UniProtKB/Swiss-Prot annotation:
It comes from the Bacteria. InterPro entries: Ribosomal_bS21, Ribosomal_bS21_CS, Ribosomal_bS21_sf. Belongs to the bacterial ribosomal protein bS21 family. It holds the Pfam family Ribosomal_S21. Keywords: Ribonucleoprotein, Ribosomal protein. One of its GO terms (molecular function) is structural constituent of ribosome. The gene is rpsU. GO terms for cellular component: ribonucleoprotein complex; ribosome. GO terms for biological process: translation. Residues 43-57 have a biased composition (Basic residues). This is Small ribosomal subunit protein bS21. The lineage of its organism: Bacteria, Bacillati, Bacillota, Clostridia, Peptostreptococcales.
């Protein structure tokens, strides 16, 4: 879990901006999107193979 300490005289907007940046850097939202719906192992393999094919060309 990302956590920030609000500094003295820091606005809520700045604190929220720092929190969002920290979440993006740690990959929290990407992980949430990835785990939002269950993905069968066979589907994962197909996506991985397709990504490898796209990367190769």
């Amino acid at each position: 879990m990302s956590e920030i300490k609000i500094k003295d005289n820091e606005s809520l907007d700045n604190a929220l901006r720092r929190f969002k940046k920290q979440c993006a850097k740690s990959g929290v939202m990407a992980e949430v999107r990835k785990r939002e719906h269950y993905e069968k192992p066979s589907v994962k393999r197909k996506k991985k193979a397709e990504a490898a094919r796209k990367k190769k060309f």
